[in-house]
């Protein structure tokens, strides 16, 4: 939780 792009769910 901070200033970073959302991480997409891994397949």
Swiss-Prot record:
Its main location: secreted. The modification Pyrrolidone carboxylic acid is found at residue 1. One of its GO terms (biological process) is regulation of blood pressure. Keywords: Hypotensive agent, Metalloenzyme inhibitor, Metalloprotease inhibitor, Protease inhibitor, Pyrrolidone carboxylic acid, Secreted, Toxin. One of its GO terms (molecular function) is peptidase inhibitor activity. It is found in: Secreted. GO terms for cellular component: extracellular region. Belongs to the bradykinin-potentiating peptide family. This peptide evokes slight hypotension (-2 mmHg), when injected alone into rats. It has no bradykinin-potentiating effect, when 60 nmol of BPP-11h are coinjected with 0.5 ug of bradykinin into rats. It inhibits angiotensin converting enzyme (ACE) activity with a K(i)app of 87.07 uM. This is Bradykinin-potentiating peptide 11h. It comes from Bothrops jararaca (Jararaca).
